[in-house]
Amino acid sequence: MASRGPTVVDVTPDDLWLVMEAYWKEKGLVRQHLDSYNAFIDHGMQEVIDEFGGVKPDIPDFEVKFGKVRLGEPEFQEAQGQRKPLYPMDARIRNLTYSAPIYLELIPVVNGVSQEAVEVRIGELPIMLKSKACRLYGLSDEELIKLGEDPKDPGGYFIVNGSERVIVSIEDLAPNKTLVERDERQNRIIAKCFSYRHGYRALITVERRKDGILYVKLPNVPRPVKFVYVMRALGLLSDREIVEAVSDDPRIQHVLFDNLEDASDVTTQEEALDYIGKLSLPGQPKEYRLRRAQNIIDNNLLPHMGVEEKDRKAKAYYLGMMALRVLELSLGLRGEDDKDHYANKRLKLAGDLLMDLFRVAFGQLVKDMQYQMTKTYQRKGERYTFENIQRFVRNSIRPDVLSERIEHALATGSWPGGRTGVSQLLDRTNYISTLSHLRRVTSPLSREQPHFEARDLHGTHWGRICPTETPEGPNCGLVKNLALMSQITTGVPEEEVREYLERLGVVPIEERRPNPDLWRLYLNGVLVGTVEDGEGFVNRIRTDRRSGKISDIINVALYQDEDVKEIYVNSDDGRVRRPLIIVENGRPKLTREHVEAIKNGSLTWSDLVKMGVIEYLDAEEEENALVATWPWEVTEEHTHLELMPAAILGIPASLVPYPEHNARPRNTYGAGMAKQSLGLGWANFRIRVDTRGHLMHYPQVPLVNSRIMKAVGFEERPAGQNFVVAVLSYAGYNMEDAIIMNKASIERGLARSTFFRTYEAEEKRYLGGQTDRFEIPDPTIQGYLGERYYRHLDEDGIIFPESKVNGKDVLVGRTSPPRFLEEQSGLGGIILQERRETSLTVRPSETGVVDKVIITETGDGTKLVKVTTRDLRIPEFGDKFASRHGQKGVIGLIVPQEDMPWTESGIVPDLIVNPHGIPSRMTVGQLIEAIGGKVASLKGRRVDGTAFIGEPEEKLRKELEELGFKHSGREVMYDGITGRRLEADVFVGVIYYQRLHHMVADKMHARSRGPVQVLTKQPTEGRAREGGLRFGEMERDVLIGHGAAMLLIERLLEESDKTEVWVCENCGHIALEDKRRGKVYCPVCGEEERISKVEMSYAFKLLLDELKAMGIRPSLKLVDRV
């Protein structure tokens, strides 16, 4: 361990905190999605269009080339045809998609001559809120408020059909990078590479089997091919060329001799190609086989290296590098690669995923254009086509092809390639849950398999991925969240970096082969050349980056051991990086002057990066760094200094005060429940029309806070209240995590909230000119509910605001045309139509007051009504509460204030929790928070409980003593019922408690009678469908065990699906009853006399019917009851 040198500490943790605040002020909290989306609209769309180049219809000497693409401003087309500007709140209220038109320049080419270009709208692209293309971009708080937006809303999501949807980042293995590992079960060593080009992903593996022979697995080839065959197919014919393509190291070459000997039967390129062709197309003529093999090695083998014939040599060298790594691992010259190391991971953000989607959607549009052009040419002939070529091109485009494909994927989350759940409905429970959802990272691994290593916390997650915030259950460790200071790269063009490296003196791989004395240089996973002085080369790159000569996106790492010397330069997108302060000669480059300049606003975060004071490191480069945790720990050996250890946490985990004093799982539960707490989630709740939402009436800022709360905006949008809490067992009503609440506190408004629910109804149009109508239905109409359900409606069929409604009350009266056109002839031959009752009603289990009614139009011009109801939620038995330390519980008793215990100073607690919940869970942080909250309330100041740098416990205890209380937080208490002093002192403090959205009012359910299923005639399932309670197999077994036969009959027959069936005593078949003629007969044997009525479960009758459908004849044998 490095010795601590006599370091002069210029900066304190408070100074570093100012620097971190400068980062959030400039970058925001969802910058990763915004940067990615902006990169997509700036150059990603153009790249995809350039990949296609143009469209070649089946018309002689005619093609259309694609030019520049541009994105318009968000707008929408009214039903009447005019296009109007569109703002996000309009899109939410009117169920529109917040999108902008895409315009593409099309250049017709006739006989090789380019004609006048025409710009055409090719479709609509959903716009990410607060991105460059959004109408909210760069607006002040006042302007946002005028547009109905919450100024604290971070953006980073889309609005599709009125719903807010977020694209969740996907974590994947780095493309185009080789990883080697041992397969112990099959005794193989494998090098894998996921080669990625233009949306196509191909897995190439090189493996060494136990006999020492190397094989290559190629896409679309069923069996592995010998490595030497593939090298010959790529054009390396002599043994010397193949050996040199791998390595100059004699140890490696010696192992390769066996491979060359084993493959000596194939010596020419044609033989090697034919061998691959035979595997891929057995039984086909040689000409086809050769063409197929050439297609495989050009297009499917390592496509990222190129798809032309001239790229084959580069591919051979890449395969040689893969073989070299396999052989080095087999000889013990290198270790296995760790695929969970974050240097080997890349995140696919909104921009990358939209690019994949846009590529597929645009491909469909190009195919459709080709079809439309060819069809028009064939139908209308050459004269029409070339008379007005611009008109011909414009008419061949159907913008809906592109728009609908993109919109459907965003609305459902189903992405090309079979991925599901890519876009999700944005979580709006509270402000923190929204931020957390926008910073979520999900892994594509299967939830069913253990994947222990993938779920584990890895050392390289430090400062990049939150160690605390992950769900419980099957997603544990696979769904993660970004840490506070994570930054994700957007990428630099590789050609620029390659040119820069060549200027620094890199010898290309084609000119000099690697040997043990040279440093191998990899650019984004591809071996590009060799360097003689590795350390000097790496230092030069770092110096140029810090001085601003090259992009700060570039990272470089150097790995050296006895046998392998490698340099990795990374400039690709999707790398998770974190900022660190540079340390030179044992002194941090951040000085007091910098801090003062940040304080007075003359210096920004970006300035510090440009000045070379701070730099971003990816997980690869951090392997070369020695990072000091605190300024006073910096020594000569250190290369960097942490900005703040608390920044390793994510946003919800940062809200937990004193997390370092809790058991790790408790912080995970605390972070999870912070996302379920009620508060002021958004300031524009009066005009929002979310399907459901909660609002706490009097949210408070925590007395024991974390500095990060202010930085992320939690203090403006809090979710919780400060409760006076006593830790006391009280008559057993708070055992098993239950809590006891003070009735008077509840009556004064403690933890009171309102629940909002929005219902919507639309006047739909049907084929044949039929429409829905908003009106008070006529009593004669089919399905009329009864007069009392329509009592609140106005004459237009829409309810009055502030009407009190109960379950099944009608909010919007509506009638619809018949589902099937059963036209009935009325008097005098006039056709009458029987309309149906399809009114919008309140959910059966809910009550409330109509809060607002919005009447508007959809994009199709149909009338749309949205009705929001509100319901006052006063804490009651069974409502769930939780502290920020994962201590959750439900209300077990509500006690009048006069019966509650009180302290010597007359304080009556709001909440009593059981002491048994503390020792086994080790939530010491909650106890320190209680003492801190007590100090804060007595002194009228906030207490800092930030992770690792919070106010020390000793200081808080000392302050309590100065205030005249015991330093332990315990107090003498008196029983509210007897008035006697309690024997033990009771721990009393102030703790920030959160009310969670799990409430009894939303879950309580019972039924006596109600709807049944059509098929089984058994009660429906679930509260929403007024379902019954399931009496399952285990419950049945209990009653059988007790011998309670009558109770069994009651539960399983009388209360469920009892039915009476006529059964023929002669043949045992179910008989038929002809009610019109008043007789019962057996359809099988014709029996009319010996037929009896039998009680049975309808499910049993259904079983009999299904057996008959299978061709099995069940027969019931009847005997008389005794």
Curated annotation (Swiss-Prot):
It is an enzyme of class 2 (transferase). One of its GO terms (biological process) is DNA-templated transcription. CDD domains: RNA_pol_B_RPB2. Its EC number is 2.7.7.6. It comes from the Archaea. PROSITE patterns: RNA_POL_BETA. SUPFAM superfamilies: beta and beta-prime subunits of DNA dependent RNA-polymerase (SSF64484). One of its GO terms (molecular function) is ribonucleoside binding. Keywords: Cytoplasm, DNA-binding, DNA-directed RNA polymerase, Metal-binding, Nucleotidyltransferase, Transcription, Transferase, Zinc. Its cofactor is Zn(2+). It catalyses: RNA(n) + a ribonucleoside 5'-triphosphate = RNA(n+1) + diphosphate. One of its GO terms (cellular component) is DNA-directed RNA polymerase complex. Binds 1 Zn(2+) per subunit. Its main location: cytoplasm. It is found in: Cytoplasm. Zn(2+) binds at C1064, C1067, C1082, C1085. Belongs to the RNA polymerase beta chain family. Part of the RNA polymerase complex. DNA-dependent RNA polymerase (RNAP) catalyzes the transcription of DNA into RNA using the four ribonucleoside triphosphates as substrates. This subunit is involved in DNA promoter recognition. PANTHER family: DNA-DIRECTED RNA POLYMERASE I SUBUNIT 2. This is DNA-directed RNA polymerase subunit Rpo2. The gene is rpo2.
